[in-house]
Amino acid sequence: MRKASVSRKTKETDIKLEFNLDGTGNSDINTSVGFLDHMFELLAFHGNFDIKLKAKGDIHVDYHHLIEDLGIVLGKAIDKTLLDRNGIKRYGFASIPMDEALAQVSIDIGGREFLIYNVKFDGYIKDIDISLFEEFFRAVSNHGKIALHINVLYGKDLHHIIEAVFKAFAKALSDASRIYGQQLPSTKGVI
């Protein structure tokens, strides 16, 4: 089983994550923010990952520190579970509709971090500025060593847009991390 435990404690956040890449979709999530709990539950379910997450942050200031640090911790956990990346499929893609919204995620978990985030919508879900999800996925990409392309083609309801992004990310990561053979997925011979 490809599992990792990652903790991060700063003056702003305290996060503990247990992540099983080869899970069954189980989750036990408590970030103290209902919408974030919902997104991580979707990530676990649609990626077939097991996620146990306890997090708290200085949300009395705003949500930036908590959301970015959750991305850091998730990225580190993904990187740890991929081990030497031998035998993985490496590339994944998903296109997910959520009612009127359509999100597409393409992913390369071959060890090179890069983020393209084409989510051209502004606003708030409750009191969370949705622009913070770009910081979340940037942290996942950087700390997970993932090239991550997120495109929202259209949508109106901000909840549906972000939910479609999380579901597409889950499906693409699940696909890319699947054991596909025994070789390192690179003609260079290294990742």
From Swiss-Prot:
UniProt-annotated location(s): Cytoplasm
Database matches in Pfam families: IGPD (PF00475)
InterPro entries hit by this protein: IGPD_sf, ImidazoleglycerolP_deHydtase, ImidazoleglycerP_deHydtase_CS, Ribosomal_Su5_D2-typ_SF
An annotated Gene Ontology molecular function: imidazoleglycerol-phosphate dehydratase activity
GO process annotations (BP): L-histidine biosynthetic process
Disulfide bonds: none
Enzyme Commission numbers on file: 4.2.1.19
Catalytic activity: D-erythro-1-(imidazol-4-yl)glycerol 3-phosphate = 3-(imidazol-4-yl)-2-oxopropyl phosphate + H2O
Tree of life domain: Bacteria
GO CC annotation, single: cytoplasm
UniProt keywords, alphabetically: Amino-acid biosynthesis, Cytoplasm, Histidine biosynthesis, Lyase
Coiled coil: none
Pathway in which the depicted protein is active: Amino-acid biosynthesis; L-histidine biosynthesis; L-histidine from 5-phospho-alpha-D-ribose 1-diphosphate: step 6/9
Similarity section: Belongs to the imidazoleglycerol-phosphate dehydratase family.
Record's protein name: Imidazoleglycerol-phosphate dehydratase
GN (gene name): hisB
